[in-house]
């Protein structure tokens, strides 16, 4: 799916819906927030935000003009409760089933302002990050228990991966033409595959380094090497007198 397809999916789900719509997505996905606000405005719905991270992102994106929000579309959460359900959209945090996120609290009747009503259409516009499947399933089950219609199936084209495909990685390597290449971020098998891609794109094997946490990388104009290691990982501090710990900690 493409971002255009996601917008089309939103349009279909809003069209003819006479119930309240609650959408959860990644708070950092500014473009997705813009898509939701656009389709809400198209169908005459007011939009409210719940979830601190979502509120902060929307505020900063608006100030920096990264988003175009039509006049009179946004309303406070307290006000949206007083409007007809078919005229409202709530954008919420909690797409990964995080405990104490806005959607989680709504699902388990712990949200102070929003109560899930039978017929509410809940749209999960995000894919599950590996490891979060169980918590997301619990939230979805609770929403169904409360009579909500939950739309989350990956075949509905409600989310697009933010990670580059192999062809996009190839294009980036072709544009940048790096002399040295260090694949980062992801599981080790992913780094191996990315390194193979670099070799396919003409980077000399000796100039490709796969470095695990703690490895020291030395780069000069002519060469790159990775031989030494330093201690790296979680550091747990118990008390204020352990090591060189500043008062801020």
Over which residues does each language-model region extend?
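Acidic/His-rich, metal-assisted hydrolase cores and their charged scaffolds
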Residues: 1-249
């Amino acid at each position: 799916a493409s971002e255009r397809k996601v917008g089309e999916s939103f349009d279909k789900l809003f069209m003819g819906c006479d119930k309240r719509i609650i959408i959860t997505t990644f708070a950092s996905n500014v473009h997705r927030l813009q898509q939701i606000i656009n389709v809400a405005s198209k169908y005459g719905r007011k939009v409210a935000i719940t979830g601190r991270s979502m509120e902060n992102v929307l505020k900063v994106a608006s100030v920096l003009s990264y988003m175009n929000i039509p006049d009179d579309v946004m309303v406070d959460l307290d006000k949206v409760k007083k409007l007809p359900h078919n005229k409202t959209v709530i954008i919420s945090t909690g797409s990964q089933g995080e405990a104490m996120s806005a959607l989680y609290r709504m699902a388990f009747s712990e949200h102070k302002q929003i109560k899930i009503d039978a017929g509410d259409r809940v749209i999960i516009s995000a894919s599950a990050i590996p490891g979060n499947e169980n918590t997301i399933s619990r939230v979805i089950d609770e929403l169904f228990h409360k009579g909500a219609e939950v739309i989350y199936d990956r075949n509905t084209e409600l989310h697009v991966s933010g990670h580059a495909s192999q062809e996009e990685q190839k294009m980036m390597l072709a544009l940048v033409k790096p002399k040295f290449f260090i694949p980062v971020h992801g599981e080790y098998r992913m780094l191996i595959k990315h390194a193979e891609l670099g070799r396919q794109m003409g980077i000399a094997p000796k100039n490709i380094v796969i470095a695990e946490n703690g490895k020291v990388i030395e780069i000069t104009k002519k060469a790159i090497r990775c031989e030494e290691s330093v201690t790296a990982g979680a550091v747990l501090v118990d008390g204020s007198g352990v090591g060189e710990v500043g008062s801020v900690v």
